[in-house]
Regions:
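Extracellular and organelle-lumenal recognition/adhesion modules and their flexible linkers in secreted
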Residues: 17, 57, 156
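N-terminal pre-domain segments of enzymes
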Residues: 23-52
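Bacterial N-terminal signal peptides that target proteins for export
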Residues: 1-11
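Catalytic nucleophile-elbow at a beta strand-turn-alpha helix junction centered on a G-D-S/GDSL motif
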Residues: 53-68, 94-97
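Alpha-helical cap/lid subdomain in secreted, periplasmic
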Residues: 1, 45, 50, 71-87, ...
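Hydrophobic h-region of N-terminal signal peptides that target proteins for export
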Residues: 12-21
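Short, histidine-centered active-site or binding-site loop motifs used for metal coordination
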Residues: 60, 92, 123-125
Length: 435
């Protein structure tokens, strides 16, 4: 057999092997709804990728410009992991596709010297039409160029997928197909994201699969009025935005241990870990000062405009928001825990193993301080949209980009400082009484 024939034979064998060994897929729940979807398996992140002092750029389209998942991320990083001292800017732009961001990222983003960036494109890139190879090629080429541009400036990248759609968008005159067609197209772009992350050695945040799986689960539980994709089918409300934020925070590799409070009921002593200090333990009341907050979320579980409702669909509390209370040497079967003005009854067994105060107390002694920081974050991010869209790309920016950047930074700095000023230690107390 000559070289040509050996080469052809080898190529045929390789092709056969590729057919026999398809792309490894993520297992999905059983049922007709999920049967058409073939999500490629991504490489999970096994380490914390955030570094102390990181400057995070949150990039995306109108879903990012809603300033909801980006706000959850920034508030979480500010109060839950304060020792990392991560600063955040959001760069969302309504209607944007990956090629559009590529054309503006030098002027709008790289000038601020981010060290890590998240991207969330694909929703507009799929054009609200059934997938075609041309759609995939344009998205893949632009996304790869974005990743490479970030990498050339020393920026670590978390390549985020788009989410899902819940109904056909009424405002898109060129929309074609049906909801399943669109979601299958978004899945193709998600699979491209997986491939890009692997080939470019960057990280991947899977927004699509949690939205697909949990959106369907929520529909079965709460009915058609509950839409994890948002009432317009594209722009999620707080429940869906929490799912998105979880996907990125999880991709960051954060450990989620926000500290432990241990009370020895026999010895009448207490100890803490994390950003919590014992101020005193007198007459059964433990007083603490905490410079590390839990993420506080309220709202009804069956309400898609509720952040806490989003926590029903992803393990946010278990993986990212654990403030643990544990007791030693209990003498009763049950105890009532008073945490400031709030209370809950636990078995001694549960308390001995440790309970998650953040999960069990929607309202708690941190709630007021948390809301102040969160509102300061919202105010800053609102200005960041004005800074980029109206000033950088308005008359001031067209006349003198550098002057526009310098002047807007002077306006932004007090908004950054307000977040720091509002983030103050919280003094709170815990009292445990036998039932």
């Amino acid at each position: 057999m000559n070289l040509f024939h050996r080469t052809v034979t080898a190529l045929i064998a390789c092709s056969a092997a590729l057919v026999i060994q398809p792309q490894t897929l993520v297992p999905l729940p059983e049922g007709a709804f999920f049967e058409p979807f073939r999500p490629h398996l991504s490489v999970p992140n096994q380490e914390r990728i955030l570094r102390e002092g990181d400057r995070l750029a949150v990039c995306g389209d109108s879903i990012t410009e809603q300033k909801m998942y980006s706000r959850i991320i920034e508030t979480y990083l500010t109060v839950c992991v304060p020792d990392l001292r991560v600063s955040v800017r959001q760069f969302g732009w309504s209607g944007e596709r990956a090629p559009g961001f590529l054309s503006r990222m030098t002027n709008d983003v790289l000038r601020f010297r981010p060290t890590i960036a998240t991207t969330c494109y694909g929703m507009n890139d799929h054009r609200y039409q059934p997938f075609t190879a041309e759609i995939g090629d344009v998205y893949s080429q632009s996304s790869r160029a974005i990743i490479q541009a970030f990498k050339s400036h020393g920026v670590r990248v978390v390549q985020g997928s788009a989410g899902t759609v819940g109904k056909m968008p009424s405002w898109v005159q060129t929309a074609k197909g049906n909801v399943q067609d669109l979601n299958l197209g978004l899945l193709e772009l998600r699979n491209i994201d997986v491939q890009l992350a692997r080939e470019e050695n960057v990280y991947f945040a899977d927004v699509f699969l949690p939205m697909l799986i949990q959106g369907h689960t929520a529909l079965q539980k709460y009915g058609a009025s509950y839409m994890i994709t948002g009432k317009d089918g594209v722009h999620p409300d707080w429940a869906g935005q929490l799912v998105m934020a979880y996907s990125f925070l999880n991709a960051f590799g954060l450990e989620g241990n926000l500290g432990q409070i241990t009370i020895d009921l026999d010895n009448k002593s207490a100890s803490t870990t994390g950003g919590h200090e014992v101020q005193g333990y007198n007459d059964g009341r433990l007083t603490l000062s905490s410079r590390q907050y839990p993420f506080c979320a309220t709202g009804a579980l069956g309400d898609d405009s509720s952040i806490r409702s989003g926590m029903e669909w992803v393990p946010f509390m278990e993986e990212l928001n654990r403030l643990t209370l544990k007791i030693k040497n209990p003498s009763a079967d049950r105890y009532r825990v008073y945490w400031g003005a709030f209370e809950k009854v636990y078995s001694s067994e549960a308390l001995s193993q440790g309970v998650n105060l953040a999960a069990d107390f929607p309202e708690n002694p941190f709630s007021e301080a948390f809301r102040k920081v969160d509102q300061a974050v919202a105010t800053k991010q609102a200005y960041e949209t004005r800074q980029i869209k109206q000033i950088f790309h308005g008359p001031e920016g067209r006349a003198d980009k550098e002057m526009a950047a310098a002047l807007t930074e002077k306006t932004r700095e007090p908004l950054v400082r307000a977040i720091r000023d509002d983030f103050q230690p919280v003094v709170h107390s815990i009292r445990i009484v036998s039932e």
